Amino acid sequence: MGPYFTVSPMLTEEEARAIREFLERKSAAEKRMRKESTAQRNRPALEAMKAVRRISETIVHLLDGFSLEVVKGRSVHELLADACRRLERSGVIVDADVVIEELRRRESLGGLGVPGTTLALYHARSFAVLRPSLTMYRLDAPQTVPGMDGEPMEINTVVLLLGPSDADKEMLTVLSEVSSLLVKDEQSLAVLAHGGEEEVYSLVSAHLEQFFDHYWTSMKE
């Protein structure tokens, strides 16, 4: 039972003031409880919208910064070093040397050539990377690199995929989705290995748009 007042038929000024103060406190408490209840109901929706925003921001960064360059007379390591220094100048990374070292470390752990293709995926996460980045490099002559299966293989295209070391799970999901393009279907692989910049961009953007649509639909269910 809540608080109650015993009053005479004719309220004194003190009794009236006590009742008013009680009613004001009760009203304020009820408003606060309603506000907290609404906030708790809305929190899952808010978190879902934040996740969608992080997904879309990652996709925008990747597509905004995408480029495909034909490289002549450079080894894979040389083109990676050049690429990282350009990304440093454009503000994507803050220390090219750190990222170059991380790429070489990843390569030493296992081959990065994708078996059954002419593609190699060089990827790294580092504190020196400020935002996700996807760039590609077409070699003017095939080069031999270790494949992911441990066997040497010839490649004509290097895919460079970078992300911050503190990437959230939404960003990692998008980066993983980009990687999945390299093992998709023969038509997609042909575009990645031989298509021009606009053709490859269209493939990547369509793939990520489809992924985003599916993600958004799943969040609304």
Regions flagged by a language model, labelled:
Residues M1-E221:
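Cytosolic covalent-transfer regions centered on His/Cys nucleophiles
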